[in-house]
Regions:
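Mixed-charge, glycine-accented linear interaction segment located at domain edges/termini
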Residues: 140-195
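Glycine-rich loops and low-complexity Gly/Arg-rich segments
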Residues: 71-73, 105-110, 168-172
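Short helix-loop boundary/capping segments
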Residues: 90-145
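Intrinsically disordered, low-complexity regions of eukaryotic proteins
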Residues: 57-61, 71, 124, 182, ...
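Solvent-exposed edge beta-strands and adjacent loop segments
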Residues: 1-92, 147-165
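Solvent-exposed residues in well-ordered beta-strands and their adjoining turns
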Residues: 83-87, 130, 171-175
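Ordered hydrophobic segments in well-structured contexts
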Residues: 2-5, 12-22, 122-128, 137-144, ...
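Beta-strand secondary-structure signal
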Residues: 79-83, 124-126, 167-171
Length: 195
């Protein structure tokens, strides 16, 4: 059949497995410190980046809707969501967004009614990419969410003879210090042969 085909480079451009969430990543070297992995997840990770547009020709007579010359991009909404299977006090604080870990009792996490600048933090999702994904030179897709804040709250779903599940959602935020900087970046790097 003439159109039952796939691109010849398909197997070099596949993203594989669930990936990981980390607090830090170095794209230049493709290295992750294991102590920066935020937690074990289940069911994979979902990232969405949705633009918000204004149609400046919307109220102009004789102007068709969605005239490309009059389309204005207002902002981006970038979210990442999934389910953690592991949790500790640092992760609970992060999921609550506005919260503090106790100074004298480090087992206690107390929510606040105000958001502090320190509640925002960068989050990276990194997944294996390409047909060459060895331990040293493996390819990756990485998404850097800047100024991320938990907007899904703290949730736990327990079950009989099951692991507890902690659903999460983080939203990237613009900053007044760099209002023109879109708060996410995407890196795609093909792997190379291992030495």
């Amino acid at each position: 059949m003439k159109f039952t085909q796939i691109p010849t480079n398909t197997f070099k451009e596949l993203q594989l497995n669930a990936g990981i969430l980390t607090s830090n990543f170095t794209p230049a070297t493709g290295t992750v410190e294991s102590n920066n992995i935020l937690g074990a997840t289940s069911g994979g990770i979902n990232f969405t980046a949705t633009p918000s547009y204004t149609d400046l020709g919307d109220d102009i007579d004789n102007c068709p809707k969605n005239m490309m010359e009059l389309k204005k991009l207002d902002s981006w909404e970038a979210k990442i969501s999934g389910t953690f299977l592991t949790v500790n006090t640092a992760q609970a604080k992060s999921l609550l967004a506005a919260a503090d870990v106790g100074g004298s009792d480090t087992t206690k996490v107390t929510p606040r009614n105000d958001v502090a600048p320190t509640d925002f933090d960068d989050i990276w999702w990194i997944g294996d990419y390409s047909d060459k994904n060895g331990a040293t030179n493996g390819g990756y897709i990485a998404i850097h969410m800047m100024n991320a804040l938990s907007t899904g709250g703290f949730q736990i779903q327990s079950g009989d003879k099951a692991k507890g599940q902690f659903a999460f959602e983080y939203t990237a935020h613009y900053s007044m210090d760099a209002a023109d900087t879109v708060p996410f970046e995407i890196y795609i790097k093909a792997g190379t042969e291992e030495a």
